[in-house]
Design a protein with these regions (language model features):
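Short alpha-helix boundary/capping motifs
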Residues: 99, 107-110, 150-154, 163, ...
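Gly/Gly-Pro-rich "capping" loops immediately C-terminal to redox-active cysteine motifs
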Residues: 68, 72, 84-124, 138
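Residue-level signal for pocket-adjacent positions within structured domains
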Residues: 56, 98, 130-133
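Periplasmic c-type cytochrome electron-transfer domains
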Residues: 2-69, 113-119, 138-153, 171-184
């Protein structure tokens, strides 16, 4: 009987303790805070399971020179502010949590960005975004072809890319807004 009473009290106290933890601002909510235990697990395991289930194995858009160039223009406009350009990492990405990966820099085993992922996986991330990461979904911003073009660009980041595409990817972004003109 004591066990059941203890169990019942524990079942009542646990949600109250969780509510108090949340109510008094204890969870890590600032980007500089340490992650919660199992935070990466909570996001990455189900995300990869869903991607595996929904992955398009044969991309409808190939990595032609034209598609790579269009993908580079899209990347510069929609992605580079967070993910950087070739040789020009995005400085404010360091203030994000998790930090946005720089997609033109080599990482483990010399892989550049996400070029070790199939284009369909990158497409899924571009289209749907990634919760708890700051990565938005672009389904309402880009059309299907555009999402595939930028996905093919990133999937081929570790391969020879046409020189005009590479030239575009090396140009710095102009992120300084034009000065506002006074209105009367």
């Amino acid at each position: 009987m004591r066990f059941l009473v203890g169990l019942l009290i524990g079942l009542l106290i646990f949600p109250i303790a969780i509510a108090a933890y949340l109510k008094f601002g204890q969870p890590p909510v600032a980007t500089a805070d340490a992650p919660l235990p199992f935070e990466a697990f909570i996001v990455h395991i189900p995300m990869h399971a869903r991607i595996d289930r929904e992955l398009v194995k044969t991309p409808p858009v190939g990595p032609s020179a034209t598609n790579l160039m269009i993908g580079a223009h899209i990347y510069r406009k929609q992605c580079a502010a967070c993910h950087g350009l070739y040789g020009l990492p995005a400085s404010f990405a360091k203030g994000m949590f998790p930090e946005a990966p720089q997609l033109w820099e080599p990482h483990g085993n010399g892989v550049v960005g996400v070029s070790d992922d199939p284009p369909g996986e990158t497409y899924w991330k571009v289209a749907n975004g990634i919760r708890l990461s700051g990565m938005p979904g672009f389904k309402k911003v880009l059309n299907e072809t555009e999402m595939w073009q930028v996905s093919q660009l990133l999937a081929n980041a570790d391969k020879p890319i046409p020189s005009d595409v590479m030239t575009l990817l090396k140009q710095p972004l102009d992120l300084d807004p034009a000065p506002a003109t006074p209105t009367q």
